[in-house]
Amino acid sequence: KERIIEYIGDSYTCGYGTESSNKERFKPETENQNLTYACAMARYFDADQIVVAHSGMGISRNYNGNVKGYFMPDRYLQTYDLVKDVKWDAKSFPLKPGITVIYLGTNDFSTGMQPAERLFVKNYITLLKEIKDNYGEDYPILCVAPKNDLLMFDYIRKALDSCGLKNVHIMALTKSVHNNDSDMGADGHPNYAGHLKKAHAMIPYVSTITGWELTGNEVK
């Protein structure tokens, strides 16, 4: 396809529990990336997607503090998910996305804890610079602040305010973006209905930033 969206995320972007109800625990067979906000938004814009996502990953703190010293800014540089020493050369790849959407931070603020602001901001800027190094100074990035902690928006905004980079944007998903009953799947993750609501919230931002016009397409 002519349009491509790159997504960088965690279990939400992986589709963790999208085929579950909120009364079920997670099972691998209920993970379906095709039912995420990312795929719904790509379908809306008739775009392909590049997905760099791994459950439990954060910017400066992984879920419950697991795997210290190795975060999504490290994993983003890899060609393979579990192979650290083979780096991805984006400049040699013939296709370039039109925008990168970062949807990270939930795990940083997981289990009732908050990451150190200075390290979070530092690592977030590192990720932004990695993306710019891949695609160019003027390349657009949309940073999405998840809904689980309002402080996260301030952390991400501070990273954007101090990074010195152009064409980097921010939006926030608040707790009202979806409900905690019929929109929820396994283990506190949204199901397909919840993901569609997230996609509806993000689509106007992507349209404005990229210049891709809103269409009459159904978000599905």
Give a label for each model feature.
Residues D85-K96, I131-Y135, I209-T215:
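Surface-exposed acidic, glycine-flexible loop patches that form ligand/cofactor-binding
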Residues K1-I8, Y12-Q33, T210-K220:
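N-terminal secretory targeting modules
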Residues T13, D46, I50, G105, ...:
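Sec-exported extracytoplasmic/periplasmic mature domains
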Residues T18, K23-P115, K147-F153, H189:
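Conserved SGNH/GDSL esterase-like catalytic core that processes O-acyl groups on lipids
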